[in-house]
Design a protein with these regions (language model features):
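Conserved GNAT-fold acetyl-CoA-binding loop/helix
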Residues: 26-46
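Short, P/G- and charge-enriched loop/turn segments at secondary-structure junctions
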Residues: 45-48, 134
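Short loop/turn motifs at secondary-structure junctions and domain boundaries
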Residues: 48-54
Length: 153
């Protein structure tokens, strides 16, 4: 039986799970994203993610359980997306179904994503949903694959 995958607005109770997912050692290694301390994480989410009306933020719910999130935001004149799924939801097609649903709601195009080079699962997910790799960019010490969906791809 296929899992139910839905999107909904973020509720305050989701943030503790998002923090726990960020602290998963394998997820941190794959993303090369250093987990933040609880207070820094909560402040970032409340002020920068949820506090910016230009952002579009959705919680991924699988069979009634909070599985992760998708976020769209502006960086200068480019609209980016990012996401985080708990490890229990990897490799089961959940990311593909959730991203497909998110892209139906987030209609800005072109839309960009830049997972770290080596995060092949994330690159594959984006490509399955129509993103095309256009090159690489550096963020600090890490090289990232720049992918785009829509015009300019």
């Amino acid at each position: 039986m296929e899992n139910s995958v839905q999107l909904r607005d973020v509720v305050p109770e989701d943030l503790e799970l998002f923090l726990a997912y960020e602290h998963d050692p394998d997820a941190a290694r794959r993303s090369r994203f250093a987990p933040r301390e609880s207070e820094a994480f909560m402040t970032h989410w409340r002020t920068r993610v949820l506090g910016d009306p230009a952002n579009f933020v959705q919680t991924v719910v699988v069979d009634g359980e909070t599985a992760g999130n998708f976020v769209a935001w502006w960086e200068e004149d480019r609209r980016f997306i990012g996401y985080w799924l708990g490890r229990a939801y990897w490799g089961r097609g959940i990311g593909t179904r959730a991203l497909t649903a998110f892209l139906e709601r987030e209609t800005a195009r072109p839309l960009y994503a830049d997972p770290v080079v080596g995060n092949t699962g994330s690159v594959r997910l984006l490509e399955k949903c129509g993103f095309t790799a256009t090159g690489t960019v550096r963020h600090g010490e890490n090289e990232h694959v720049l992918l785009v969906l829509g015009e300019g791809a």
